[in-house]
Amino acid sequence: MGIRSLTRIEAERRSALVTVERYDVDIDLTALPNGPEIRCVSTVTFTCSEPGAETFVDCAAEVRSATLNGTALTPGDDGRIPLPGLAARNVLRVESLQADTTTSPGAHKAVDPADGEVYLWTSFEPDEARFVWACFDQPDLKAPHAFTVTAPAAWTVLSNSGDPRVEEQGAARRWSFPDTPPLSVYNTVVNAGPFHEIRREAGGHDLGVFARRSLAEVLERDADEIFTLTGQGLAFFAEAFAMPFPQRKYDQVFMPEFGGAMENYGCVTWSDMFLRRATPTHAERELLAVVLLHEMAHMWFGNIVTMRWWDDLWLNEAFAEFACHWAAEGATRYTDVWAGHLAGGKLRAYLSDQGPVSHPIHQPIHDVAQAASIFDSITYPKGASVLQQLMTYVGEDRFRTGMAAYFARHAWGTTTLQDLIDALAEAGDRDLATWRKAWLETAGTDRFTLEHDGSTVILVADGTPRPQVLAVGAYDRTGDALERAALVRVEVSEPRTPVTGLPATSDLLLINDDDLTFATTRPDPAGRDTLFRVAARLPTAISRGVAVATVWDMLTAGEATAAEAGRCLTAVLAAETSDAVIEPFLTLVTNIAELWAPDADRPALTEAVAGVCLQLADDPGRRQVALRGLARTATAEGLARLRDQADDDVDLRWRALVREAELGGDVTAESAALLERDPDPDAWVRALTVRAAVPDPAAKAETWQRLAVDRTVPVQSVGAVAAAFWRPGQDALLAPYAERYLAEIPRLDQGGMIPAMVYTSQLFPPYAIDSAYVERAQQAVQEAAPVVRNTLLERSDTVRRMLRARAVNA
């Protein structure tokens, strides 16, 4: 029998029966320098509301021994240990072994190729703690955790509560951490290794940042900014939620081979890819700020107050995604962060919400496996945008009042969505029951356009819209620019809403100006060409972003060509003044040229993008971003200029080599020489990325083996290598690998949720396929794990839209 996924009914029954008093977890890491094993002893003290009843504890690790109140237990073969004959108060002791920390979920051993040092991280969301030690792996059974960790003497061990007692034991040291506050199992963590550490004080908090030793110089470079952002975020959330972060110590640990970041209470784990080896661009620094504040928001929304079950996963993640942008705009230098959100995640969410995996933001979750499949664009950027609209709908002051009441009422407990709705409703005068049903329990996206009825402008919805507040901006030409003549907020609840207060005539009316709601828009028929032509002249980053969002949505819906969208985007880029959107817009238009344009149009559109990059490169503040864009789009002539401009910039040289390899240049010797002098411990991945782009059967075979079969590429680098592997114009070489992708589907979920999402989406072929292949892939995935199925269905729908766009003449 395979490892079973916990169902909601099982969780509710167990929660009604069991109250966990505490976890005492003893972990032995001393075998890791020379092998893959972790040994754990988990002691769980809990009470039972019905003495004599039976339940189970989760343990998908190898069970060496298990006793309940001194009586030996027999583990099942489904990742569970039956617990019969429960007493009123119980002590469960389970000794377990995780025999493989290289590919199994829950805990991961990484070896730094620079110096051979070993690092260990754990990451448990949604239910992967059970692969390491025995626990009640569900969010509502919160309890204090006391971790004791034995590790090699040269290592530092980090966990949630900080300030451990450390005992010397010869070649090892034993770290005993104080009790955590009541936490869900998935919010606990152990990170270990010979870290480079930096500490600062800020606002009464003891802040630490950690990375592997080979990245010490990079960590030192970025530490000031990380500490500044951390202090700003802690102060903002303390005021916004009327509750300071209750623990003095707040650590952030940058780990190798980690995907994304994880909000463990008081000890956030990051991928060390966020420590950029090259000087970070503005967009990369802004992303660092957004992720830092996202994970920090979880300290309150997720850790202090926790969802009762995974049907409120959306709220956990959407709230953190909303709050990080709210805090970044209000407390940091990244004041255009909502424009960046629109240019990136929100555009992805619009596309996802119109595809085969569109779902209500809040939906019943049968089991944890289903929960793992909705860490998606609807949960994150759409959810964040909906919460932004909720704050607009009720007013920010009342929103803050409601949030403060929510945290005061439910601290260290668990809640449902209704608890939050009740707190916000009590703080204001809005009926949120209708809002909740329309926004959270109904799938899909509203669409608005404008009609003119004499002198009256009518905002027209496609169907009955959700209750919302949005704005319509009126713009007039002033020379070569557009200036806003009026901005009218409109409260919408009916299919047709008159908009009063607009000028009698305007050169452009922009629906959803200021981007206050989550809705797609269409210009009126007479204004379509105007919007495409003058989007670049709009006066703010957010207004230009709203126009770009409309153009993008029309492209993905088959209502605009890639050439039209590309011309609009290149014009916007040439005029753009906000660093928050230049890089995401450049990525978007490059993707349009590569992935959406017909073969006949691709060279001209790619050349146009390269021309904008050369123009932007004349601005010293944007030179780095522009040259990176040039590295994706340059012809042989452009590459020569890129080489001249790159000088000793190792990052740009790697990027140029990828493009030169794709174009058929012999870069083998130069790649080897650059690998030799690149100080980045992960430079071998850059060399493999160059190799992946080479239009040669041997290069493709080697890359596929390392990327998809052996999985030696760190998960955070899979996307970059895969993008170099799947290149336009190489269909004959790539066609066999499209078939191999289908053969890989049954094992795409190996390694846990994050690898499953990454491998499924990034390896899906965008070239060397047709619409029949997309249908075959969608059929082949029907029996796969939910996270693989949903990820593949979403990605394949996007590729289907790309194929349609490529078949359309400009």
Task: Describe each region flagged by the PLM.
Residues 1-248, 349-353, 375-381, 392-397, ...:
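Acidic/His-enriched low-complexity segments
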Residues 14-27, 144-145, 223, 327, ...:
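Charged, low-complexity, helix-prone segments enriched in Lys/Glu/Asp/Gln
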Residues 50-52, 87, 165-172, 203, ...:
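Short, glycine- and charge-enriched coil/turn segments that flank and shape catalytic ligand pockets
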Residues 61, 338-339, 705-710:
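Charge-dense, low-complexity polyampholytic segments
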Residues 67-68, 148-151, 213, 297, ...:
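Non-catalytic accessory/interaction domains
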Residues 97-100, 112-120, 125-127, 142, ...:
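Extended hydrophobic/aromatic-rich secondary-structure runs
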Residues 177, 209-464, 591-592, 607-608, ...:
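Hydrophobic alpha-helical and helix-loop surface patches within well-folded domains
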Residues 182, 274-275, 692:
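Hydrophobic pocket-lining residues within nucleotide cofactor-binding pockets
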